[in-house]
C-alpha cells in the first residue's frame, strides 16, 4: 500500500498544480525528490558517547539507520580533527519520505511550542526548502523519559521545482503550514 500523501499527490495535488502553474505535461509538475534530516553534534568531538543516543533518536524519527557525518578538515579552534564524527544524517526517498512528511505536517509541527507556521523565507532559490526544528521531542516516536539531551535538526525538502514560487505552491498543496505575513 502506498503512503497516504503519495496517493493524494497523484490524485489531487498533481492535477491542481498543473492547472495552477499552467503546465501541459504532467511530468513537468514539480514533485518532492527527497527529504534529508541532518543533526549536527558539535559536542560529540569531546565525548563520542553523546552520539549514540542521538543517532538512535534520529533512527526512530526517520525509520531508517542514519549515517554519521565526519569532519572534512581539522579545525584547531573547534578542537576538531579530520575524520572525527560530528553529526548524523538520513536521506528519505519514496514511501518513507511521504510517510515522514505526513507525520511532520500532521503531528510534529503542531506540537512545537508557540507555533504560528513555518517561515516562507527558507527557500534556497532553487526550489528546495529547509526547516529547523529546535528539539526532537515534537515527534511521537521519541520517549521523553529516555532523552538525555535536547537536540535540534535541519529538515531539507528537495523538490524538482526550478524556482521558489512553484516549490512554495507544491508544499502548500501538501499542507505545509506557512506563516501568514501581515
Swiss-Prot record:
One of its GO terms (biological process) is translation. Coiled coil: none annotated. Pfam families: Ribosomal_L5, Ribosomal_L5_C. Keywords: Ribonucleoprotein, Ribosomal protein, RNA-binding, rRNA-binding, tRNA-binding. InterPro entries: Ribosomal_uL5 (IPR002132), Ribosomal_uL5_bac-type (IPR020930), Ribosomal_uL5_C (IPR031309), Ribosomal_uL5_CS (IPR020929), Ribosomal_uL5_dom_sf (IPR022803), Ribosomal_uL5_N (IPR031310). GO terms for molecular function: rRNA binding; structural constituent of ribosome; tRNA binding. It comes from the Bacteria. One of its GO terms (cellular component) is ribonucleoprotein complex. Gene3D superfamilies: 3.30.1440.10. Part of the 50S ribosomal subunit; part of the 5S rRNA/L5/L18/L25 subcomplex. Contacts the 5S rRNA and the P site tRNA. Forms a bridge to the 30S subunit in the 70S ribosome. This is one of the proteins that bind and probably mediate the attachment of the 5S RNA into the large ribosomal subunit, where it forms part of the central protuberance. In the 70S ribosome it contacts protein S13 of the 30S subunit (bridge B1b), connecting the 2 subunits; this bridge is implicated in subunit movement. Contacts the P site tRNA; the 5S rRNA and some of its associated proteins might help stabilize positioning of ribosome-bound tRNAs. HAMAP family: Ribosomal_uL5_B. Belongs to the universal ribosomal protein uL5 family. This is Large ribosomal subunit protein uL5. It comes from Acidobacterium capsulatum (strain ATCC 51196 / DSM 11244 / BCRC 80197 / JCM 7670 / NBRC 15755 / NCIMB 13165 / 161). The lineage of its organism: Bacteria, Pseudomonadati, Acidobacteriota, Terriglobia, Terriglobales.
